[in-house]
């Protein structure tokens, strides 16, 4: 917290359950259950208690942050806070280490424009319609988050949700299509596992 949150001005960020509870101002997690006997039907959203296990391993879903905090983090990882995250550190973090063929398949179900998935140190690298893209995403019970940026354009997006809706992951290709001037597809309207016609 002293090495990153404070110097980056991430005033609401913390890495423990106690700090989250003490803040009093945070979005409660929401879930919904699949209806019995239905493959595509779900019940209503309902609020649930937070799951304490996520804070036992801070690197695995144990950070609490507001959208303002995440905006500061996005500035840092895009090279605008070299006093905290020097360029050589970012280069090390973002250098691809392994190819991710399973990630290619998963992301193709979100948008076929995601290709060439690789894994760096905690970050995924893709080519989105040929444009370099760096991203990190994850979910825990009742929450989902995604941060992504186009390093050659110095533009990024942060998506935070107090649910694990699969539509959350479809916001990113919608944003990327707008930013890159690509033909628009209604990714949010697509069912899971389908791709829009003509978007190969």
Walk through the language-model features, giving the residues of each.
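Short, surface-exposed loop or secondary-structure junction motifs
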Residues: 1-141
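Short, low-complexity, polar/charged sequence segments that are solvent-exposed and flexible
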Residues: 33-36, 112, 141-144, 153-155, ...
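Residue-level recognition of conserved structural "scaffold" positions that shape functional pockets
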Residues: 68-69, 129, 145, 149, ...
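Short coil/turn residues that cap or connect secondary-structure elements
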Residues: 81, 142, 163-167
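Short, well-ordered beta-strand elements
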Residues: 135-136, 146-162
């Amino acid at each position: 917290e002293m090495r990153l949150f404070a110097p980056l001005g991430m005033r609401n960020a913390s890495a423990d359950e106690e700090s989250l509870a003490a803040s009093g101002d945070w979005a409660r997690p929401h879930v919904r259950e699949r209806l019995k006997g239905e493959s595509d039907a779900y019940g209503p959203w309902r609020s649930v208690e937070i799951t304490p296990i996520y804070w036992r391993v801070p690197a695995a879903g144990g950070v609490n942050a507001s959208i303002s905090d995440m905006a500061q983090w996005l500035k840092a990882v895009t090279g605008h806070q070299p006093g905290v995250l020097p360029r050589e550190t970012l280069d090390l973090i973002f250098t691809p280490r392994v190819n991710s063929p399973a990630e290619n398949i998963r992301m193709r179900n979100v948008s076929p424009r995601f290709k060439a998935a690789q894994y760096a140190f905690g970050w995924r690298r893709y080519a989105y319609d040929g444009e370099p893209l760096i991203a990190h995403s994850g979910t825990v019970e009742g929450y989902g988050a995604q941060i992504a940026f186009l390093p050659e354009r110095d533009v990024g997006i942060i998506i935070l949700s107090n649910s694990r809706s699969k539509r959350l992951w479809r916001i990113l290709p919608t944003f990327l299509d707008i930013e890159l001037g690509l033909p628009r597809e209604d990714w949010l309207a697509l069912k899971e596992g389908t791709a829009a016609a003509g978007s190969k």
